[in-house]
Curated annotation (Swiss-Prot):
GO terms under cellular component: bacterial nucleoid; cytoplasm
First-listed, main subcellular location of the protein, grouped into a coarse class: cytoplasm
Keyword set includes Methyltransferase: no
Superkingdom classification of source: Bacteria
InterPro entries linked to this entry: RdgC (IPR007476)
Function as written in the Swiss-Prot or TrEMBL entry: May be involved in recombination.
Protein name, entry field: Recombination-associated protein RdgC
Amino acid sequence: MLWFKNVMIYRLNRPIELSVEQIEQQLSAFAFTPCGSQDMAKSGWVPPMGAKSDALTHSIPGHVLLCLRKEEKILPSSVVKQELEGKISKLENDQSRKLRKTDKDALKDELLHQLMPRAFSRFGQTLLWLDLANDLVLVDAGSARKAEDCLAMLRKSIGSLPVVPLTMEKPIEMTLTEWVRSGEPAAGFAIQDEAELKVLLEEGGILRCKKQDLSSDEIAVHIEAGKLVTKLALDWRERVQFLLGDDGTVKRLKFSDTLREQNDDIDREDFAARFDADFLLMTGELTGLIAELIAGLGGEAPRQG
């Protein structure tokens, strides 16, 4: 299966009251269909197991995996600009007058309509994991905007999705700064060699460190001068490495070779069995990581609702 590369974590304010079968049924009304000749973009659900299954959900007890596909039509701006300039020039010569902005805008709309069937498509897929056992929704996305787009589609599909970003009681940057300053992260975590330090005042300085000893005097001087650690590379129990942001995002997930090879005894020809085992393994590891991360960061902020 496709292991998550990033995790945007959201807290469900109340449990999803649907069974896996009901989720499957409601997603089917929003299954992916390709763009028509005049569509700029379309999104819809596809089987997480790809061509190996028709099911729009893949589940193990307490956990459901979904996959959202998006198709975007791409028209190179240079092509549009060149063709539009040619049409504007011809019309202005024919009519012996300069076109107004409204005329140019109308001409551009007409041109886009004509060019759309010739546009090429860009496809993307995003995995979503419903952790029903812990009332979390996790999205394999590198940006909040991409994650929110996926959540909006899920909300539209199942009728309701009361989620908020997972939030800590204490500002994460304060905790990360203390970890680096003291050299003592929470139990189970080890500081790696990458960080971002920032002065939180407007137009404050930013220091990005890679392959650097974060326990050095140089880093200590920056912290003493008021910079806070806003991103920090961490290792969790020598099993998972990641970059934690002050907004709670977990990026650049890297699962250890030992972990990923754990299911190598399963015949790769048995795709479904291997997919199932990998999903079980990944959810188990990330559930443990997230639980220890929440505790290590001082606990979650009180839930609303």
